[in-house]
Amino acid sequence: MLDIQLLRKDIDGVAKRLADRGYILDVAAFSALEAERRAIQTRTEELQAKRNSLSKQIGAMKGRGEDTSAVMAEVGGIGDEMKASAVQLEDIQKRLSDLLLGVPNLAHESVPVGNDEAGNVEVRRWGTPRQFDFEIKDHVDVGTPLGLDFETGAKLSGARFTLLRGQIARLHRALAQFMIDTHTQQHGYTEVYTPYIVNPEILFGTGQLPKFADDMFRVEKGGGENTVTQYLISTSEISLTNTVRDSIVDSNELPIKLTAHSPCFRSEAGSYGRDTRGMIRQHQFDKVEMVQIVSPDTSYDALEQMVAHAEVILQKLELPYRVITLCTGDMGFSAAKTYDLEVWVPAQNTYREISSCSNTEAFQARRMQARFRNAQGKPELVHTLNGSGLAVGRTLVAVLENFQNADGSVTVPAALRPYLGGVDRLEVKASA
């Protein structure tokens, strides 16, 4: 959530910066609510001053033995009016809050201005895409003989679900373990096992609600008036970041660096017809997430560090990739700045997103009321960052395609072999 003081001080400037993100702020609605709020607050202050004055007058009158009933009745009337004003003010504050809940974060000044992904800027590349001397297969054709089972996944759960069997399932698990081990042993993150089902207010904290309810899977328990609504997490960023919700941490605890391996559940409501083949876009997929909770003066250094941590995974796996800075029109709702890492997918002859690392500055912290004590001992909002380290399913796709062999086997990247008991190749089992 944006700091409302920014809008009060420079509504036109904020509106312009939001327009760069493709969001049109309802300036008239905000200004009207603000005018109403100021009028009520001014009237309340006037009533308070008058009541204080009359209360002093009553004391003096009693000292002189005078009748105070008329003045006391007037004070009572003022009290009633103040109560009514308080109700009005609470309603206006809620309407202002509801308006702000739908407003995205402001982009950092270093973010390129653009309307969509065409405005993104490439930062660097690593690795050289392999030149194949045989016809490239996509991960579906490579993986199906090795244990990818789309047919059974669809039978069990419908479209965009996949069943993994045998050596493919083991490779998938190895990838996640390798990522977690790297982040905890080399990058200083603490591993966390989080709930996969969270309460609605948790999603308000990280920005998925109220704006993106259609992207979430909702679950209900109980029935009738006792129904309780909760949501499946779309990323463990949600649960990891909210661990500091409604709390004040000591500055010496920062940075807090957390990582988790979890399934993620997304309805893909806006992706109809996109990536319908294979594992690129699924309703359920695994991801290793990185979250950092830091002081404001270190958050952009932390963002660069987080990107480097995700890059280490790709480099250890020997997967070519590129890093891009997302433009204003392509960033996520909560982000102030985002880098995407895109891995080379040979069958598509292009790079595809495999990690997204974002600094949300104080946007999520304000919604969560997550603070730390600064050098002066005063509570101040933390900055929160999140990044994929990496999306496990898409990494599996990249390994299958980049390490495929002409005979249908897949060479196991050296970094993963210790997790597979030394196995260096996945091979198609001969039919009986």
From Swiss-Prot:
Domain of life per record: Bacteria
Localization terms from the record: Cytoplasm
NAD listed as a keyword: no
Name of the top EC class for this enzyme: ligase
UniProt GO molecular function: ATP binding; serine-tRNA ligase activity
Binding-site residues, L-serine: 235-237, 289, 388
Major localisation: cytoplasm
Cited function: Catalyzes the attachment of serine to tRNA(Ser). Is also able to aminoacylate tRNA(Sec) with serine, to form the misacylated tRNA L-seryl-tRNA(Sec), which will be further converted into selenocysteinyl-tRNA(Sec).
Protein name: Serine--tRNA ligase
Species: Paraburkholderia phymatum (strain DSM 17167 / CIP 108236 / LMG 21445 / STM815) (Burkholderia phymatum)
Gene that specifies this protein: serS
